């Protein structure tokens, strides 16, 4: 990942870096890897995420049908 610094504006470069890392999911990944996750917990989390994605997709589809 690369961030250019213009006019010695380090604060802006740090903000850009944080935004890029957030967009890439780096913070979420670091938080996940901080502690070991048992395979059973990983399966449970993945299943919950899939359900969340499905519900979100269904909500968006129902809202698109209303408009």
From Swiss-Prot:
InterPro entries, sorted: Ribosomal_bS21, Ribosomal_bS21_sf
Gene3D superfamilies assigned to the protein according to its UniProt record, in alphabetical order: Ribosomal protein S8
Source species, domain of life: Bacteria
GO BP: translation
Protein keywords: Ribonucleoprotein, Ribosomal protein
Gene Ontology CC terms, in alphabetical order: ribonucleoprotein complex; ribosome
GO molecular function, one term: structural constituent of ribosome
PANTHER family: MITOCHONDRIAL 28S RIBOSOMAL PROTEIN S21, SMALL RIBOSOMAL SUBUNIT PROTEIN BS21M
Annotated family: Belongs to the bacterial ribosomal protein bS21 family.
Protein name, entry field: Small ribosomal subunit protein bS21
Provenance organism: Magnetococcus marinus (strain ATCC BAA-1437 / JCM 17883 / MC-1)
Organism lineage string: Bacteria, Pseudomonadati, Pseudomonadota, Alphaproteobacteria, Magnetococcales
Gene: rpsU
